[in-house]
Amino acid sequence: MSINATLFVQAIVFAILVWFTMKFVWPPIMKALDERAQKIADGLAAADKAKSELSVANKRVEEELAKSRGESAVRLAEAERRAQALIEEAKAKATEEGSKIIAAAKVEAEQQTVKARETLREQVAALAVKGAEQILRKEVNAGVHADLLGRLKTEL
């Protein structure tokens, strides 16, 4: 065979190889590449969707946190207000109780003062009678002189 015939036969074999490759090899390779490209595109789309969902979820979390902080601040303020009210109520009760105790002590002191004065009057009257008895050198009868002794007590 000459170089021309070999070249012609090689060209025909090459053409058959190209046709065979285009007909049977190329379509599955292109299909696999297209499927892979589609999977990559779907993965990127899913990643973008997940990213947007994540940002939405983060916004919701921030809103919930802000809401929770606000609610906790309100509850804390309410608790402080209640505590202050309880403190004021306790102070008022303590003041009232202290006033009652002071009033009772004043009444008791007044009663003791009156009792002490009465006892002192009786003792002074008895001393006055004894003094008069000593002066007169005779016994003074308390039953007979009760009116006189009563006037002495009131004067003292």
UniProtKB/Swiss-Prot annotation:
Keywords noted in UniProt: ATP synthesis, Cell inner membrane, Cell membrane, CF(0), Hydrogen ion transport, Ion transport, Membrane, Transmembrane, Transmembrane helix, Transport
Keyword Aminoacyl-tRNA synthetase part of the UniProt annotation: no
GO molecular function, one term: proton-transporting ATPase activity, rotational mechanism
Pfam families, per database record: ATP-synt_B
Listed CDD domains: ATP-synt_Fo_b
Keyword presence, Transmembrane: yes
Membrane topology annotation: Single-pass membrane protein
GO cellular component: plasma membrane; proton-transporting ATP synthase complex
Chief location bin: membrane
InterPro entries per record: ATP_synth_B-like_membr_sf, ATP_synth_b/b'su_bac/chlpt, ATP_synth_F0_bsu_bac, ATP_synthase_B_chain
Cell compartment(s), UniProt: Cell inner membrane
Transmembrane region(s): 7-27
UniProt xrefs under PANTHER family: ATP SYNTHASE SUBUNIT B, ATP SYNTHASE SUBUNIT B', CHLOROPLASTIC
Family recorded in the similarity comment: Belongs to the ATPase B chain family.
Subunit architecture: F-type ATPases have 2 components, F(1) - the catalytic core - and F(0) - the membrane proton channel. F(1) has five subunits: alpha(3), beta(3), gamma(1), delta(1), epsilon(1). F(0) has three main subunits: a(1), b(2) and c(10-14). The alpha and beta chains form an alternating ring which encloses part of the gamma chain. F(1) is attached to F(0) by a central stalk formed by the gamma and epsilon chains, while a peripheral stalk is formed by the delta and b chains.
Function: F(1)F(0) ATP synthase produces ATP from ADP in the presence of a proton or sodium gradient. F-type ATPases consist of two structural domains, F(1) containing the extramembraneous catalytic core and F(0) containing the membrane proton channel, linked together by a central stalk and a peripheral stalk. During catalysis, ATP synthesis in the catalytic domain of F(1) is coupled via a rotary mechanism of the central stalk subunits to proton translocation.
Protein name: ATP synthase subunit b
